[in-house]
């Protein structure tokens, strides 16, 4: 059975056009699967919004090409254009919309507009991308946060789990394992 994801995405530009970045949050069953953000150089806020959408859909497609996706964005323009209710007049926006459609099967994606205050997580990531801007380099790799360690406070130590498999023991043929109820 195909998985179901929620994608919230946001983009921002300081100057419009100006330095721009995006943030995207991928969730499954209410749990965050991935946080993505990237600085994209000088662009408009609409270009940054589309880039966040494309990054999120691309990531979801890499997890499960047949997954259904609920996209939630505070950009009325992107939501309405991707839903087919508004025309896409500018050629650069048409190209970005085509990239978004190519990133994941359009029939598996549903778009919803949400108020800005419900998109604060993706907005924070977009601002993080802008704050961490790396001097205008043209080659950027989107950052995926390791959700288990990158969100720790400075005084916390990440838990390390080791799975050790020892192979067969004298009890293996009898199916007697540590913690089992057999005597």
Residue ranges and their predicted role:
Residues 1-47, 51, 58-63, 161-167, ...:
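RNase H-like nuclease fold core
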Residues 12-16, 53-126:
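RNase H catalytic domain
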Residues 66, 136-138, 179-181:
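Short amphipathic alpha-helical leader/targeting segments
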Residues 88-89, 93-176:
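Terminal low-complexity/intrinsically disordered segments and their adjoining alpha-helical capping regions
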């Amino acid at each position: 059975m195909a998985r179901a994801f929620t994608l919230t995405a946001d983009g921002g530009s300081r100057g419009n056009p100006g330095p721009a970045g995006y943030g995207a949050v991928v969730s499954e069953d209410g749990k965050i699967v991935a946080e993505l953000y990237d600085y994209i150089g000088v662009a408009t806020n609409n270009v940054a919004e589309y880039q966040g959408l494309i990054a999120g859909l691309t990531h979801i497609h890499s997890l499960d090409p047949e997954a259904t996706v609920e996209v939630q964005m505070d950009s009325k323009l992107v939501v309405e254009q991707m839903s087919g209710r508004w025309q896409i007049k500018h050629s650069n926006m048409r190209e970005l919309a085509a990239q978004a459609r190519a990133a994941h099967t359009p029939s598996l994606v549903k778009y919803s507009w949400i108020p800005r205050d419900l998109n604060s997580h993706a907005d924070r990531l977009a601002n993080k991308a802008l704050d961490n801007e790396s001097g205008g380099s043209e080659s950027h790799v989107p950052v995926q946060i390791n959700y288990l360690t990158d969100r720790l406070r400075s005084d916390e130590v990440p838990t390390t789990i080791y799975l050790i498999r020892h192979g067969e023991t004298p009890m293996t043929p009898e199916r007697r394992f540590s913690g089992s109820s057999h005597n």
